[in-house]
Curated annotation (Swiss-Prot):
The beta-hairpin motif is involved in DNA binding. This is UvrABC system protein B. SUPFAM superfamilies: C-terminal UvrC-binding domain of UvrB, P-loop containing nucleoside triphosphate hydrolases. Keywords: ATP-binding, Cytoplasm, DNA damage, DNA excision, DNA repair, Excision nuclease, Nucleotide-binding, SOS response. A motif (Beta-hairpin) lies at residues 96-119. Transmembrane segments: none annotated. The UvrABC repair system catalyzes the recognition and processing of DNA lesions. A damage recognition complex composed of 2 UvrA and 2 UvrB subunits scans DNA for abnormalities. Upon binding of the UvrA(2)B(2) complex to a putative damaged site, the DNA wraps around one UvrB monomer. DNA wrap is dependent on ATP binding by UvrB and probably causes local melting of the DNA helix, facilitating insertion of UvrB beta-hairpin between the DNA strands. Then UvrB probes one DNA strand for the presence of a lesion. CDD domains: DEXHc_UvrB, SF2_C_UvrB. InterPro entries: Helicase/UvrB_N (IPR006935), Helicase_ATP-bd (IPR014001), Helicase_C-like (IPR001650), P-loop_NTPase (IPR027417), UVR_dom (IPR001943), UVR_dom_sf (IPR036876), UvrB (IPR004807), UvrB_inter (IPR041471).
Length: 673
């Protein structure tokens, strides 16, 4: 049995709560301590909502799940919490698919589409680390997406998979090997790889995904007794120090004891008979025969190997659960855990819609004899099931929706920013002559060495406007979905570094463009009714100019819409509160000074301490072979992309090119000699 580590949350920050943060922290904590289930933090852009959340977690000292509506924002939150809580377990749980084509059937074409998927190994590793941390300790913060409500294996089975190894333990190499295999690790006769183990004489090495850092465990035995355990670098094999013991968990969170497989087989067979009889009774002989062939093949594979393709469709039988819903990430948390729903006005509707889409696809598979009805239970949670799993929740948004406002016991405003910055002034201008007017406003900002964001309604408009501005001598680039992730990050980096002055985009909300150098946001066609010009979207877009003391928003329109009017009124309300507060407290707003750098060097330095070499020595090749140098950098590049650390990925990509070029030159010189 694993005894959970009881470590307090330690918040590392150069700053103390300021502005509206102390009041917001106190009010939300009081509401939670009173036992209220729902509370809302209504915080403007740049008010430090993440820092407020961090303080609540630290003060209440409870495990926390923070959910966001996309991977990019989740990755940003993950990095922030990693910085705030360096001594605690901060984990990342998002979809591990780079490509996913679900199993489906199109009746109109009599077309069955097999499941196809490409799994991202690094994301999968982070998911394993998440459930491992939750099994081992309480000081855990998990940043996740909608993946948190999708089906997982039994948390009890996973916790029971834990095996401890310690110095002085009486155990043979064969027994160790059998345990590793039971936990789904594979033996390798080649170089040690992640999630594999090797045996050389009396030495066993294993590299588990569940551990943070690129290190493996080396177990040294003498006459069926463990005499030494070391941590060693997975790449250089350098000894990183001795340890008395370590606990190993299964390499998968879908742990299925073989006895469960044996118990499931007769249940599956029984349901197969019932469903085949149902088809026959309704004249569906083709469906009955199809189902019989498919399921009987799966049963044979389960008998022989304990596994079959699409085994998740039999999770209802294999889990041993009597619940009507599947297990999910929430089940791995203790009962007193806290939930924070970031950007709740977007995230909650996303969670609400997951079940229906999944159900309609699988219903076709069941109705046409491709799957048993039990396959419907391998699914995301229904919204009411999601709500039932919530212990206590804080909705976080600058623009909370009706649901958050109606359910919450308290809705706490966080309007005053610690920096004293106020919401931007808003000017409305008719669209007649808007291009000339926009060009004039851009020139004013360029003269002040400030930046501009322009939002349009279509990709074509953004490209045409960018071309128009470039022809006028403006340093501008467009930003939209046809650019890949690294290209988008490069464009944003160019803006921050003053290599361009203007970005033209469509949905600038999703890009995470909180850039302090931006002092002007221009909204074209601000009056057009639709998602990108709703009250909520307009308020969020206005916030892009809220990190600069000269922040200004210009809305170009033909006729002022209701959404425009509501967004302007709400922004002006907040702006007046902020101005009054600054006057009362003699505060002069100052633009946020955000250092233009990436976190590559810091992360690499941390990794260097673990794996035993310096970044500079990686480049010069003083510690590792040339092949391993490039392999290591490629590994870091893949990890950076998976973590959404795209600026780091760009630097790593360039380093790989640089190193490859040096190796190529060295080879050519060698040939000449």
């Amino acid at each position: 049995m694993v005894v959970k580590l009881m470590i307090d949350f330690f918040l590392k920050s150069e700053y103390l709560p300021a502005g509206d943060q102390p009041k917001a922290i106190k009010e939300i904590e009081n509401s939670i301590l009173l036992g209220n289930k729902y509370q809302t933090l209504k915080g403007v852009t740049g008010s430090g909502k993440t820092f407020t959340i961090a303080n609540i977690i630290k003060d209440l000292n409870r495990p926390a799940l923070v959910v966001s509506h996309n991977k990019t924002l989740a990755a940003q939150l993950y990095r922030e919490f990693k910085d705030f809580f360096p001594n605690n377990a901060v984990e990342y749980f998002v979809s591990y698919y780079d490509y996913y084509q679900p199993e489906s059937y199109v009746p109109s074409k009599d077309l069955f589409i097999e499941k196809e998927a490409t799994i991202n190994t690094e994301i999968e590793i982070k998911r394993i680390r998440t459930v491992t941390s939750l099994a081992k300790r309480r000081d855990v913060i998990v940043v996740a997406t909608v993946s948190s409500i999708y089906a997982l294996g039994s948390p009890d089975f996973f916790k029971k998979s834990a095996r401890e190894f310690f110095v002085g333990q009486k155990i043979s190499i064969k027994e160790i090997s059998d345990i590793f295999v039971e936990l789904y690790y594979e033996r390798t006769l080649m170089n040690l790889e992640r999630d594999k183990f090797s045996i050389k004489g009396d030495i066993v090495e294993i590299w588990p995904s569940s551990e943070h850092g690129e290190f493996a465990y080396r177990i040294c035995l003498d006459f069926d007794e463990i005499v030494e355990i070391y941590r060693v670098s997975s790449f250089s094999k350098k000894n990183l120090g001795a340890t008395n013991s370590f606990t190993l968990f299964a390499k998968s969170y879908f742990v299925i004891p073989y006895e469960n497989v044996l118990e499931a087989i007769p249940k599956i067979s029984h349901d197969l008979s019932l469903q085949c009889q149902y088809f026959k009774d309704n004249g569906k002989l083709v469906e009955a025969e199809r189902l019989k062939q498919r399921v009987e093949y799966d049963l044979e594979m389960l008998r022989e190997t304990g596994f079959c393709s699409g085994i998740e469709n039999y999770s209802k039988y294999l889990s041993g659960s009597t619940m009507e819903r599947p297990y999910c990430l929430f089940d791995f948390f203790p009962k007193d855990x806290l939930l924070f729903v970031d950007e709740s006005h977007v995230t909650l509707p996303q969670f609400r819609g997951m079940y229906n889409g999944d159900h309609s696809r699988k219903l076709n598979l069941v109705n046409f004899g491709f799957r048993l009805p039990a396959a419907l239970e391998n699914r995301p949670l229904k919204y009411d099931e999601f709500e039932a799993l919530i212990n206590q929740v804080v909705f976080v948004s600058a623009t909370p929706g009706v649901e958050e406002n109606e359910k919450s016991s308290v809705v706490v405003d966080q309007i005053i920013r610690p920096t004293g910055l106020v919401d931007p002034e808003i000017i409305t201008r008719h669209s007649d002559g808007q291009m000339e007017d926009l060009y004039s406003e851009i020139q004013k900002r360029v003269a002040l060495k400030e930046r501009v964001l322009i939002t349009t309604l279509t990709k074509k408009m953004s490209e045409d406007l960018t071309e128009y501005l470039v022809n006028l001598g403006v340093r501008a680039k467009y930003l939209h979905s046809e650019l890949d992730t690294l290209e988008r990050v490069e464009v944003i980096s160019l803006l921050r570094k003053s290599e361009i002055d203007v970005i033209v985009g469509i949905n600038l909300l999703r890009e995470g463009l909180d850039i302090p150098e931006v002092s002007l946001v221009a909204i074209l066609d601000a009056d057009k009714v639709g998602f990108l010009r709703s009250t909520t979207s307009l308020i969020q877009t206005i916030g892009r100019a809220a990190r600069n003391s000269n922040g200004l928003v210009i809305m170009y329109y033909d006729k002022i819409s209701l959404a425009m009017r509501e967004a302007i009124e709400e922004t002006n309300r907040r702006r007046q509160i902020q101005i009054d507060y600054n006057k009362k407290n003699n505060i002069t707003p100052k633009t946020i000074v955000k250092k233009i750098q990436n976190i590559l060097e810091k992360e690499l330095n941390n990794k260097n301490k673990n794996v035993g070499y310096d970044f500079e020595k990686i480049i010069s090749g003083e510690r590792l072979s040339k092949k391993k140098l490039i392999d290591k950098l490629k590994f870091d590049l893949e990890e950076a992309v998976n973590d959404e650390r795209f600026e780091d990925a760009i630097v790593l990509r360039d380093k790989i090119k640089e190193l490859s070029s040096k190796i190529s030159i060295a080879r050519n010189k060698k040939r000449e000699v």
